[in-house]
Amino acid sequence: MCAIAGMIGAHLEERSLRKLLETMQPRGPDGSGVFQNKNVTLLHTRLAIIDPAGGQQPMILDWAGERYVLTYNGELYNTQELRHRLISRGHTFRTHSDTEVVLHAYAEYGTGCTELFNGIFAFGVWEVNARRLFLARDRIGRALQRHAEEILRHGGPGQIPVQDG
């Protein structure tokens, strides 16, 4: 399993980012990534199983005037089916990872994308232009997600849609 984390409301210095990534590293020894934009930070450490070269995260997609940033942990069992469905709707893919399928599905279907997913997952998507964070996990909660009180303090529950798959 990978490790994902995020924060809204503070800009983390390089030293703090390194320290946080070190604590996440045992769950994701194959690579790490950080997205930081003003007061939003998304972090990811990766256990590479599918498409080791192409699934680096956080993953960014520019689609229909919005920039989406995804940090994801999980496994979709219907990746190929969803990929074909999204291709038929005009999406193109650079990787073979289920991460990219999750990102494109969110861009196409919004929060309803989780209804299409068959698998175990937890993820966060930051919509840069809309300044909106969406958090989701699978129906059973096998892939756990945690978020700090910092999120609610700075955004308020009405600003951060949270959905249990």
Model-derived regions: residue spans:
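N-terminus-centric sequence/structural signature that marks the extreme N-terminus
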Residues: 1-165
